[in-house]
């Protein structure tokens, strides 16, 4: 029965992963904030607000979201009040060994990966009833199967992410990337919003049904957040 559940989990996970990707975007409104509506209607009750430069994730493609409204934690915001991160200035990257370096006049980002050495990590399993969930260093993981033995351990992971903005180092906590595995440099990119002094580091890691997107946000020299999908 346990094996049947795992097979079902694999099939459904792959099915969902093959669906449409959304977009990362930030709030950009002349009032400095956007209203969150309870429903997908401008006359719907206001249940909250999001300030400018708040990072969100949603489906902008008309085929999958014809309403022009993006779902957030408490409700919906209108697409016209959002700007996709891919519309900001892109900074080109260059792969050098185990690192990819993005460098221009305002920003320098170095992302380095390394091989996964299981002897340097605490690997445990959490009983989920129908299967055992793989836990690495006490955290749930992205990019690899969440169950299994040594054959499902990752090949690599992030070693470090270093950021310099206008000559000043920006500390990126290890907790912002130490649960992410199966790194792909060729799908990494960064975007810079000069007006807000905001940097967005994007990556599309993993493969097939285990693929995931991540976006880190840094504003005015301070690490703010990440969103994983």
Regions found by a protein language model. Give the residues of each.
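Acidic, glycine-rich flexible loop segments
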Residues: 171-214
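Short beta-strand elements that form the blades of beta-propeller/WD-repeat-like
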Residues: 108-110, 143-144, 197-204
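Sec-dependent N-terminal signal peptides
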Residues: 3-13
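Short N-terminal segments immediately surrounding and downstream of signal-peptide cleavage
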Residues: 18-37
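Mature extracytoplasmic domains of secretory-pathway proteins
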Residues: 135-184
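Short alpha-helix capping/helix-loop boundary micro-motifs
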Residues: 40-45
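SH3/SH3-like beta-barrel superfamily modules
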Residues: 19-24, 46-82
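Surface-exposed beta-loop interaction hotspot
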Residues: 78-142
């Amino acid at each position: 029965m346990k094996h049947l559940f795992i097979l079902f989990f694999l099939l459904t996970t792959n099915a969902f992963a093959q669906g449409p990707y959304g977009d990362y975007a930030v709030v950009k409104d002349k009032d400095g904030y956007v209203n969150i509506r309870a429903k997908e209607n401008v006359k719907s009750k206001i249940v909250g607000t999001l300030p400018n430069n708040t990072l969100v994730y949603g489906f902008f493609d008309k085929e999958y979201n014809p309403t022009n409204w993006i779902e957030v934690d408490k409700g919906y915001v209108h697409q016209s009040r959002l700007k996709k991160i891919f519309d900001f200035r892109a900074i080109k990257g260059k792969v050098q060994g185990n690192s990819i370096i993005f460098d221009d006049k305002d920003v320098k980002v170095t992302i380095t990966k390394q091989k996964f050495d299981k002897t340097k990590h605490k690997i445990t399993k959490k009983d989920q009833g129908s299967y055992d969930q793989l836990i690495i260093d006490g955290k749930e993981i992205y990019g690899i199967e969440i169950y299994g033995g040594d054959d499902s351990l990752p090949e690599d992971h992030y070693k470090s992410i270093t950021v310099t903005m206008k000559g000043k180092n920006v500390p990126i906590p290890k907790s912002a990337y130490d649960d992410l595995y199966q790194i792909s440099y060729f799908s990494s990119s960064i975007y810079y919003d000069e007006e807000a002094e905001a940097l967005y580091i994007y990556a599309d890691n993993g493969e097939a049904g285990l693929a995931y997107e991540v976006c880190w946000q840094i504003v005015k020299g301070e690490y703010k957040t990440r969103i994983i999908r």
